[in-house]
Design a protein with these regions (language model features):
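Active-site hotspot residues in diverse enzymes, especially metal/ion-binding acidic/histidine motifs
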Residues: 1-257
Length: 257
């Protein structure tokens, strides 16, 4: 049985962010360490949440394409598609945070769904399966936002931004910089320099395991980067490599789309 994330109830952004910060605070108390970047997502998953974290070819395990991650609630098992280990650390970390979000925010809905299935006599193996093609559903958006707040905590991002750029937000009016995309002396806020703005913040805050694109969108969400172009911030980034095509494997019993 797979959780239908399109049917997840609405959760306010502030509640999602608070849930992410609460988890970080719990980890800090558990580990006795100050919360700092990079956020040790894998350690939090395994040592604090007690979830088994694995890396495997999910296309073959589940039998459906474009799966980034999956979590089996009853088994306390989380599996990340092994292709993300191939030099995609930012996307890998974000996907781990995304799966953590499903555990923190959504597992109660899956367990409730499981109880209903048990009463009706249906067999089930409760799972949350995250596909690229389903990234726009309400529950998947919530998981993405949680991951962003979790691996890039607002206070830490703000601290790093102020260290580099001062107390005022940067406003983007143009698609292209007047001084060139990679000018080493002048950084003109524009869509094609958003990647460099993000990198400067990442370097200052030691956000070593996040992508530039994810950081740029986090800066925008925090009101530190204001995009007045009417275009998406991602239009200034190089296109990510497409999800690799793999042969379709055998379906995992009791897991359906």
């Amino acid at each position: 049985m797979i959780l239908d994330t399109a049917k997840i109830p609405w959760i306010p952004k502030t509640q999602i962010e608070n849930a992410a910060l609460d988890l970080l605070a719990q980890w800090g108390k558990f580990s006795g360490q100050e919360i700092g970047s990079p956020i040790p997502v894998e350690a939090i998953v395994e040592k604090y949440l007690g979830i088994t974290l694995e890396y495997d070819n999910l296309d073959e395990i589940i039998g459906i394409p474009d799966v980034l991650g999956a979590t089996w609630v009853d088994e306390k098992r989380m599996v990340i598609n092994s292709f993300l280990l191939d030099g995609r650390e930012g996307r890998f970390t974000f996907t781990c945070g995304h799966e953590v979000a499903h555990w923190v925010l959504h597992r109660k809905f899956l367990l409730h769904q499981t109880e209903d299935a048990f009463i009706s006599g249906a067999k089930n193996n409760p799972a949350v399966v995250c596909r690229v093609s389903a990234s726009k559903t309400r529950g998947e958006w919530q998981a993405d936002y949680f991951s962003s707040c979790f691996i890039m905590p607002g206070p830490k991002v703000q601290e790093a931004f102020y260290k580099v750029f001062g107390g005022n937000p940067l406003v983007i009016y143009n698609r292209k910089s007047c001084f060139g995309r990679n000018n080493p002396i002048v950084l003109d806020p524009s869509l094609d320099t958003a990647h460099q703005i993000a990198k400067n913040v990442m370097d200052a805050g030691r956000f070593l395991n996040v992508s530039r694109e994810a950081m740029a969108y986090r800066l925008e969400d925090l009101g530190l980067l204001i995009n007045e172009t009417g275009l998406l911030l991602s239009s200034g980034f190089k296109m990510s490599k497409p999800f690799p095509k793999r042969s379709k494997g055998k379906n995992l019993k009791n897991v359906a789309t």
